[in-house]
Amino acid sequence: MNNIYWYFLLISFFVNSQKIEFPIDTLVRTVHETAINGKKINYQAEVGMQPVWDEDGLPIASLFYTYYTRLNNISKNDLKNRPLIVSFNGGPGSGSLWMHIGYTGPKILKIDKEGFPIQPYGVKENPFSIIDVADIVFVNPVNTGFSRMIKNKDGEYPDREKFFGINADIKYLGSWINSFVSRKIDGNLPNT
């Protein structure tokens, strides 16, 4: 039994000593379908990282997001007029996971009426998803999920006050949302 402890400790050391970095501005898109109120809904799922920029235009954080857009009969003009729900958890330290797979996303966890998982474990279509009437972006604030602060050219992180606190959250998340809408809906940036 004592050897198992040491093996676990050694493996943990090697896993934690690896430097893992995510690209600060990247995305992956897939296409899916679901049924809501008896109607087939085609939608696009996009996961990615999008930077938070400072006053000088340098990235100071990168936020992980999941973005769902309806595809059925949606023109570019309709997309600009379609409601966008921005969802993130209240934290501190809690990502958007539970809103995502708990109630508004196109897929939800298989759970019973009391909230316990049922077998076979996994996810199922969410007949109450709002993707039929609004697009949804689930955002993980800094230090939740994969979202992180970014070191500057000197290897230093930005001041924590920029990200942790009510006013800081309002400022940087508001800026991030403006950039997101500008990129995804207004189409102001290339390769979005």
Predicted regions span which residues?
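Catalytic cysteine-centered active loop of the rhodanese-like fold, especially the PTP/DSP P-loop
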Residues: V86, N191-T192
